[in-house]
């Protein structure tokens, strides 16, 4: 019987469940995502403000250039009224003509007149810009931060919208100005009031289908399960009076670890746009990760409209600019996300690769790998890595992918035991280079073991009468050079017969061979399972000549048996 779980003793009485949304006819659970939403990167503002050391201007510029190169068309570049650094950065982008014609910069401002004037001033001379106005509307902040009722907070938003319009008309002649409003802490705001304040702001800006307003509904703090956020988004989408004049935008944070799910369900619920940061940077636990969202679409055969084909290059730039590492397990971009250590996983991946190679299909179907690592610029070298948890599949995959040695199944099992002993003794991971060292030390496929009881020095094969082969082999046997001869059904049988006459009983149980590459100078690999006395084991030989490779495999097996006796 399983022991019942025990109460934690943690102070759960301090907290209460988040209320559900009354939406019995919700439609989002039956929706599917068929195209990418509009993306807006907020790395340069929301992400930057959350850094221990905010970006220098040069780092901000490098990240801006990356975002443009990746294909982002809406980029929040700063809070110009918050710092001279942000103001100067916006001015540099405009004055140095660094904003591509198809990119719209976004700037953030609170609903205070002096901040709005400063923000609008930063945009003078720009071709197009999106001014993002926000004020907090949640019940908690109305009560403990502002001490205002609904009407008082609505007045802040409406007056802010008016100041935005007035200063834009005064200072931004010739600029294509678009508007965005965020009821900050939307998820902590009553839905009817969130709708009320958004409608009041729209009354000021008078959006049309040709000139829509962006209504951004942030989970400033993630407070519920993602399905509740989706219900909130669907409710808002249904009840907005000018829905055709609205770009409904999401801004999920990751406090509960569900930002990606919240964004995806929010899009299913009717949202048109998503704001986030590369690799989930941002306040506290971060904003939603734009890389994960984009790659999730890609993995479903949907164009993310963002270029992530060099995900390591993107990661390096983000790590440099943010001065924060990306976790090795971060979806799609972490160092270890395409890596398998588990033996059963490695075996399945190996067989998946082999099946795709055999059938020539283009549809990606490899167990444990949701996408082809090569599609994001990764190689297959790190897909399978060997440690104490690995089995024959991983070992065999690396031997084939790195060294072109296609080990027979029973040899895979035998060699994985050799590797397992090494990892048990030494611990840690075994690299491909170390794996080759273990293999050559154990099997000596090309000879060269000074302590070997049997060493191949040279050989000559001739076809005798009755289709039998005769071999003359120069060997060093127990330290003495000698020539042995034998005949049999092929060179291997003849060599085994010669050894038996010298008191080395060898019986061949299985034999495999293949070329290592192509062309006239290609080498051959031979694998021999033999019984030497009562010991059954494998030998491996490698040589440009297939006969010599086979004889080396016999020698390899005999020497291994001698070491084990």
UniProtKB/Swiss-Prot annotation:
| Claim: Protein biosynthesis is one of the keywords in the record | no
* Record SUPFAM superfamilies: 2-isopropylmalate synthase LeuA, allosteric (dimerisation) domain, Aldolase, post-HMGL domain-like
Q: What's this protein's family per the entry?
A: Belongs to the alpha-IPM synthase/homocitrate synthase family. LeuA type 2 subfamily.
Role this protein plays:
Catalyzes the condensation of the acetyl group of acetyl-CoA with 3-methyl-2-oxobutanoate (2-ketoisovalerate) to form 3-carboxy-3-hydroxy-4-methylpentanoate (2-isopropylmalate).
Named in its record, the pathway it takes part in is: Amino-acid biosynthesis; L-leucine biosynthesis; L-leucine from 3-methyl-2-oxobutanoate: step 1/4
What cofactor does this protein call for? Mg(2+)
Q: What is its main location?
A: cytoplasm
* GO annotations of cellular component type: cytoplasm
What protein is this chain from? 2-isopropylmalate synthase
Note the HAMAP family from the entry: LeuA_type2 (MF_00572)
Which molecular function terms from Gene Ontology are attached?
Answer: 2-isopropylmalate synthase activity; acetyl-CoA C-acetyltransferase activity; magnesium ion binding
Instruction: Name any Gene Ontology BP term.
Output: L-leucine biosynthetic process
Quaternary state and partners of this protein? Homodimer.
Limits of the Pyruvate carboxyltransferase domain: 37-312
Reactions catalysed, as given in the entry: 3-methyl-2-oxobutanoate + acetyl-CoA + H2O = (2S)-2-isopropylmalate + CoA + H(+)
Question: Gene3D superfamilies in the record, alphabetically?
Answer: 3.30.160.270, Aldolase class I
Report the EC number(s), separated by commas if there are several.
2.3.3.13
- The UniProt annotation puts the region (Regulatory domain) at 446-565
Q: Name one Pfam family in it.
A: LeuA_dimer
Subcellular location(s) of the protein? Cytoplasm
- Which key words are in the record? Amino-acid biosynthesis, Branched-chain amino acid biosynthesis, Cytoplasm, Leucine biosynthesis, Magnesium, Metal-binding, Transferase
Listed binding positions for Mg(2+) are 46, 251, 253, 287
Q: Which NCBIfam families match?
A: leuA_yeast, PRK03739.1
Q: What is the lineage of its organism?
A: Bacteria, Bacillati, Actinomycetota, Actinomycetes, Frankiales
């Amino acid at each position: 019987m399983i022991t019942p779980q025990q109460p934690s003793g943690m102070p759960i009485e301090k907290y209460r469940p988040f209320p559900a949304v009354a939406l019995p006819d919700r439609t989002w659970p039956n929706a599917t995502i068929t195209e990418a939403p509009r993306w807006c990167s907020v790395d340069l503002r929301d992400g930057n403000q959350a850094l221990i050391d905010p970006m220098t201007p040069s780092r901000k510029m490098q990240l801006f250039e990356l975002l443009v190169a990746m294909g982002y068309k809406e980029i929040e570049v700063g809070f110009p009224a918050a710092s001279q650094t942000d103001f100067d950065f916006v001015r540099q982008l405009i004055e140095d003509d660094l904003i591509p014609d198809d990119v719209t910069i976004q700037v953030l401002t609170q609903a205070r007149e002096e901040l709005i004037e400063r923000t609008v001033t930063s945009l003078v001379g720009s071709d197009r810009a999106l001014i993002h106005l926000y004020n907090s509307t949640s019940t908690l902040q109305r009560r403990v931060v502002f001490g205002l009722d609904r009407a008082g907070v609505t007045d802040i938003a409406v007056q802010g919208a008016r100041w935005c319009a007035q200063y834009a008309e005064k200072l931004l002649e010739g600029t294509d100005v678009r508007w965005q409003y965020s009821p900050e802490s939307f998820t902590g705001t009553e839905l009817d009031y969130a709708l009320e304040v958004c409608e009041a702001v729209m009354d000021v800006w008078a959006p049309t289908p040709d000139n829509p307003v962006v209504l951004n509904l942030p989970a400033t703090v993630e407070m519920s399960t993602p399905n509740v956020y989706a219900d909130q988004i669907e409710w808002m989408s249904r009840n907005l009076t000018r829905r055709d004049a609205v770009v409904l935008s999401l801004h999920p944070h990751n406090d509960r670890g569900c930002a990606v799910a919240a964004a995806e369900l929010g899009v299913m619920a009717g949202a048109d746009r998503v704001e986030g940061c590369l690799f989930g940077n941002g306040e506290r636990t971060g904003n939603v990760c734009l890389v994960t969202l984009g790659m999730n679409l890609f993995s479903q055969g949907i164009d993310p409209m963002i270029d992530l084909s060099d995900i390591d290059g993107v990661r390096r730039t983000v790590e440099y600019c943010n001065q924060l590492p990306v976790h090795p397990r971060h979806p799609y971009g972490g160092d270890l996300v395409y890596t398998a250590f588990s033996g059963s996983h490695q075996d399945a991946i190996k067989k998946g690769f082999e099946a795709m190679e055999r059938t020539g299909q283009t549809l990606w179907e490899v167990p444990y790998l949701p996408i082809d690592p090569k599609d994001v610029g990764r190689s297959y070298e790190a897909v399978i890595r060997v440690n104490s948890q690995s089995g024959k599949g991983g070992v065999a995959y690396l031997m084939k992918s790195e060294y072109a040695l296609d080990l027979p199944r029973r040899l895979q099992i035998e060699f994985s035991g050799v590797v397992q002993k090494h990892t048990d003794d030494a611990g840690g991971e075994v690299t491909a280079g170390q794996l080759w060292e273990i293999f050559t030390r154990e099997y000596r496929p090309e000879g060269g073991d000074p302590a070997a009881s049997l060493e191949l020095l040279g050989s000559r094969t001739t076809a005798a009468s009755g289709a039998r082969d005769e071999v003359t082999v120069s060997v060093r046997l127990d330290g003495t050079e000698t020539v042995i001869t034998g005949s049999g059904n092929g060179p291997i049988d003849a060599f085994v017969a010669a050894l038996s006459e010298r008191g080395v009983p060898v019986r061949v149980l299985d034999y495999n061979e293949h070329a290592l590459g192509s062309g006239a100078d290609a080498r051959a690999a031979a694998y021999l399972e033999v019984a030497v006395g009562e010991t059954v084991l494998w030998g491996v030989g490698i040589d440009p000549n297939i006969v010599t490779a086979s004889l080396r495999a016999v020698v390899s097996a005999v020497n291994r048996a001698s070491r084990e006796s």
